Amino acid sequence: MTEEDGKTQGMKVLGILDIHNTPCAREAILHGAAGSVAAGLLHFLATSRVKRSFDVGVAGFMITTLGSWFYCRYNNAKLRFQQRIIQEGLKNKVFYEGTDLDPTLKKTGDK
């Protein structure tokens, strides 16, 4: 990772996915690696078949990585949506503050 003009060069996986600039990529790959080791090792201990255990490990990596990726991206999208709603609410509160349209003012029966 070299510093050039204040920017860091990201690490790429397979020359495609830039881990530092892609949200949830690092965590998904780490979870996938742990899932592949666990799935492959458990399958090997249960069956003692090396090639099949390797295949199960690769499948475990893909499933765990994709599952972790989609879960993280869903939570990020949900959080962004909630932040957008709160931001609009704050903007409306500032806009209508002190006017007759202010929803926080209690209505009295004077009118």
Curated annotation (Swiss-Prot):
Residue ranges of the TM segments: 28-47, 57-74
Record carries keyword Nucleus: no
Topology relative to the membrane: Multi-pass membrane protein
Organism superkingdom: Eukaryota
GO terms (BP aspect): mitochondrial cytochrome c oxidase assembly
Record's GO cellular component terms: mitochondrial inner membrane; mitochondrion
UniProt cross-references to InterPro entries, sorted A to Z: Cox20
Keyword Metal-binding applies: no
Cysteine-cysteine disulfides: none
Mitochondrial matrix face of the membrane: 48-56
Compartments it resides in: Mitochondrion inner membrane
Pfam families xrefs: Cox20
Keywords: Membrane, Mitochondrion, Mitochondrion inner membrane, Transmembrane, Transmembrane helix
Mitochondrial intermembrane side: 1-27, 75-111
Physiological role: Essential for the assembly of the mitochondrial respiratory chain complex IV (CIV), also known as cytochrome c oxidase. Acts as a chaperone in the early steps of cytochrome c oxidase subunit II (MT-CO2/COX2) maturation, stabilizing the newly synthesized protein and presenting it to metallochaperones SCO1/2 which in turn facilitates the incorporation of the mature MT-CO2/COX2 into the assembling CIV holoenzyme.
Family that this chain belongs to: Belongs to the COX20 family.
Listed name of the protein: Cytochrome c oxidase assembly protein COX20, mitochondrial
Organism of origin: Danio rerio
Name of the gene this protein is made from: cox20
